[in-house]
């Protein structure tokens, strides 16, 4: 791949343009797969893009680097936006995006840490990701590491008790290295999040 340079001083307009490019990649991937969850991927694009292109410390050549920042998609079904970002920053060739949800592909409908470089935790069951992220953040504190853990939670899954238990755990242990984004798109499987 091309050498990746992380532009930490990227402007807001450049981030917006990059998020638009990531959305276009998501639409293309899901269209080619004829399967997927476009809504949640598109609504999470701004903050996932900002994390990967401005805030996260990563090394695409060393995906398991011990001091890297971590990303947890608690709502794992929105992984197409994560895949688009990972490919663009150099974790794997962008041509792999065309294999989304294909048999044998490393890009499945939920992220798999055993298949895809750059995925820090396999997620799928809604409500569990924040607990995993809190555990990673606590491990970082106990190991005296400086990495941050970014977690994307859906507003629908925020109705799960495990989310609130994880939030209480984060507070109890002072996990200031845990950054949580709630994707408040007001949608869930069976309607709105009223």
Question: Which positions does each model-derived feature cover?
Answer:
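N-terminal capping segment at the start of a domain
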Residues: 19-35, 183-184
């Amino acid at each position: 791949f091309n050498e990746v340079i992380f532009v930490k001083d990227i402007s807001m307009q450049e981030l917006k343009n990059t998020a638009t490019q990531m959305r276009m990649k998501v639409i293309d991937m899901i269209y080619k797969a004829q399967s997927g969850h476009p809504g949640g991927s598109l609504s999470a694009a701004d903050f996932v893009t900002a994390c990967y292109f401005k805030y996260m410390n990563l090394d695409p050549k060393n995906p398991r680097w011990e001091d890297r920042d971590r990303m947890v998609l608690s709502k794992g079904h929105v992984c197409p936006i994560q895949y688009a970002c990972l490919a663009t920053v150099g974790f794997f060739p962008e041509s792999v995006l065309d294999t989304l949800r294909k048999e044998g592909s490393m890009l499945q409908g939920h992220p798999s840490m055993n298949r895809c470089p750059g995925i820090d935790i396999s997620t799928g069951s809604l409500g569990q990701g924040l607990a995993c992220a809190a555990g990673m953040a606590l491990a970082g504190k106990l190991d005296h590491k400086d990495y941050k853990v970014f977690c994307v939670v859906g507003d629908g899954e925020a109705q799960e008790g495990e989310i609130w238990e994880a939030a209480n755990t984060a507070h109890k242990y002072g996990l200031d290295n845990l950054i949580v984004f709630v994707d408040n798109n007001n949608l869930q499987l069976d309607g709105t999040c009223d």
